[in-house]
Amino acid sequence: MRPWKIGNLPVDFDVETKKVLKALPAAHAALAELKGVASTIPNQSILINTLGLQEAKDSSAIENIITTHDDLYKSGLNLNAFKSLEAKEVQNYISALKKGFELISESGLLTNNMILEIQEILENNKAGFRKLPGTELKNSATGDTIYIPPQDPQEIMDLMTNLEQYINTPGMQDCDPLIKMAIIHFQFESIHPFYDGNGRAGRIINILYLILQKLQNLPVLYLSNYIIKNKQVYYNSLQQVREENLWEEWILFMLKGVEITARETIELISKIKELMLYYKHRLRATYKFYSQDLLNNLFKHPYTKIEFVVKDLGVSRLTAANYLNVLAEDNMLRKEKLGTGNYYINTELFDLLSKRSKQP
């Protein structure tokens, strides 16, 4: 099998077919509703943390990096001695996602240098774009080679330069931004510019592109859960574009993913909001030390600790410990020991987030 010859963008095929145009309104309506619902959560870091961690877990699972919710949230406590290798990789993902969001928020662009910076955080190395031949995509069950991406370093660089222009130049292809997102994702996956972490980097690019296009304000629309549930269709659709130019099927698959995921995320955010309101009423009615900052802390960190409360509330360590211990005694939180320290679980939020990922 020889490396597949990738063409430059824009795509020289009809990507706005009747079926695609018919599918667009539902995807856009769901996205618009999600954008509005997300804005009703008072502290944006709550959604970025809780949904971002879930996305990090799901996106890594596609690459067979498996971690439990318990390991994931423990790793967020920043106790390195207790982090599994898998949990560290998932934490790298959330760090890369946050960095990407920060970079595009500052510049309004998504450049190759930013993509390289995201990849560096993801993989914890500075390998950059591939310079050595030998990368092949294989069937995990049979070991057969199913796709060989470009091998020449200059070709990879040229294709990534073209992709950078396509992402940041609206006039290069006059089509709906959701169609462009599907094309960008296909192109990046096909270039496969890195030695490792291409899938995770590509899914971060999806999220950031939606924000660049002002279809979302926050990184909360995550397609990884949809891809996990439709993994074989996802890989088959990518390959069918390469082999048969079946762009319509690929774009429809991605549009359906946007619509379904947006609807699921709206439901999840609504449940988080309801739970926050329940906690707010209980805390405010029962404890003199209630504050919005404390409530935000308990939802920003499904597993919180004294140091987090000290930082978020600006109180002493003794005061923070007292707050958390009182809440644990009253079963608002569950206190657990880890090494020489303690952490505190918002069990209802934990159950909500972990059940979501188990849905068929």
Can you say where each PLM-predicted feature lies in the sequence?
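FIC/Doc superfamily catalytic core
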Residues: 1-360
